[in-house]
Amino acid sequence: MIIQIISGFLGAGKTTFINKYISGNKGKTVIIENEFGKIGLDKKLIQGNIPVREINSGCICCSLVTDFRESIRAIMDEFSPERIIIEPSGVAQLSDILKVCNFFNREYGIEISDKIVIVDIESFEDCLEDFGNFYVDQIENASVIMFSNIEKVENSDIERILLKMREINPKASIFKEDWRKITSEEIEAILEESRKNIVKARETDNSDKTHSSEEHHHHPADNIFESVSFSNIKNFSEKDMEELKEKIAEGYFGKVIRAKGIIPSDSEESSENFKYWHFDSNLSSFNFDKIKMENLPNFDSDDKSGNVILIGSNLKRNKIEKYFLK
C-alpha cells in the first residue's frame, strides 16, 4: 500500500486535481479529506465510487493526529486499499503531515510515494508575501509541483515565479503546463518519472534527511485564519450569486481568503437535475455554476439544506449569518 499526499494552499485546486487524477484509477483507492472548518464540503465534490473519509474541525497534522491515525488503521482493515490519497486542509503544513505519515512508514512499511503540491500560480507571489514561511513550507517539501490558473499568467511572469520556486525547492519536479489539459494517465507518468528521480537522488546522497520526530507544535494557522461554516442556507438566484461575488471582493464579510459552498437555487430553471449552485472563491477568482445531483455521488439527504464555508481573518460572523442563513 502507498500513501499519496495532494496538498496546496486554500483554493489552489486540490479537489479538482484529485477528480482528474482518479478518473483513470486502476487500483483500489480510498481518499481522506481534511477540512479546517466544522463542515466538510470537498467529500461531496469527489466524483466516482471511491470511498471517502472525512476528518473535520482542525488539521490532521496537529489537533487531529489521533483521528488521522485511527482513520488510516480503519481504512487498512476495512478496505485493504492499494493506495490512500490524503487531501490535507489548505492551511496544513506539509512538513507536519509528513511527520504523521512517517509513523505508518516505520510501523507498517507504507510508502509515501508522492508529495504533490498544487499551486495557484496567479496568487503565488501575493501568498508568498502575505504568509511567508507558512506558505513556503508546502513548496519546499513537495516532490511534484503542478500549477493552477497558468493560462492567466504571462510567460515572463511564469519564468520569474519558476526561479523563485527553484530557490525554495531545487529538487521537485515542476510541471510547467496546465494539468487540466492532460489525462490521468499522463499525470501518473509525470509522478512515476518523479519517483525515479527521487530514487536516483537517494542513491547518490547517503545523508539521512528523514525527520522522525513527532513533536507537534501549536499550529500557526490557528493564529492566522478563522473559519465560519453553516448549513440550512437560503435559496439564491443567479443575481444573488453575482452579488455574493461582489460582497466577498469588497470585504463585506471580513478578509475572506477562501469561500466555497453548495447553495439551494430559487431559479425558475431549477429542476430535478439542477437544484443547487456550487461556488468556489479564492484570492484570485470567484466562480459559480449549476450543479446536477448526478454529479454529487457523496451528497446525501442531510446535505439538502446546503453548506457554506468561509475561511479568512477578522470574519464578521453576524453579517455572514444574516446573509446566508434562512
Model features per residue range: what roles?
Residues 2-128:
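Nucleotide-state-sensitive switch-loop elements of NTP-binding domains
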Residues 14, 149, 258-260:
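Basic side chains
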Residues 54-57, 77-79, 130-134, 192-195, ...:
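A general structural signal for short secondary-structure boundary/capping elements
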Residues 79, 83-184:
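Phosphate/Mg2+-binding loops and adjacent switch elements
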Residues 137, 144, 153-306, 314-326:
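C-terminal accessory "lid"/substrate-recognition subdomains
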Residues 310:
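Flexible loop/N-cap segments at domain edges
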